[in-house]
Amino acid sequence: VKTGFLLDVNVLIAMAWPAHSAHEKVQEWLSRHAREGWATCPLTQTAFVRIISNPAFSPNALAPGDAATLLQANVGHPSHRFWADELSFNQVLEVLAPRLAGHQQVTDCYLLGLAIHKKGKLATMDRAIPSLLPEKSRERDFVELV
């Protein structure tokens, strides 16, 4: 049973931040897929608040409390599901370690592992994420490029 889409932090930010360059694209994607359910997890929620409240992100960055309020407003959507971090990073590495090449893939690796575990898909705009899986792997079906 498919359990929907885990939004990576970039998709989550683009969804909630109208000035984001991919806001329209993500909104269109969500209009087609929201009924299948979309999810966040502690990692993506924390990263959302951290990034949205960073002045380097935008001259209009929010205070952390306001960023958390924006997050809460979005995860209040009826199609949203919360996925707990049910896996240790070592459990994810059992499957994905052979393809993990650099420090910038660590978070992506965990999110992909969580999506696979939940029988959902990781929704991302990062075209490199499928490379965490072997080229002809059926598990590449767990990645949804937005």
Regions from the language model: what does each represent?
Residues 18, 39-46, 68-100:
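Acidic catalytic patch
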Residues 1-40, 52-69, 137:
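Short, well-structured N-terminal submotif of metal-dependent ribonuclease cores
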Residues 26, 107-108:
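Amphipathic coiled-coil/heptad-repeat helices and related helical stalk/stem segments
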Residues 7, 106-107:
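A generic structural signal for residues located within well-ordered alpha-helices
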Residues 33, 74-75, 115:
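A generic structural signal for well-ordered alpha-helical segments
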Residues 88-101, 109-146:
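Acidic, PIN/NYN-like endoribonuclease modules and their adjacent C-terminal/linker elements
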Residues 12, 45-48, 129-130:
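A generic structural signal for short hydrophobic patches within well-formed alpha-helices
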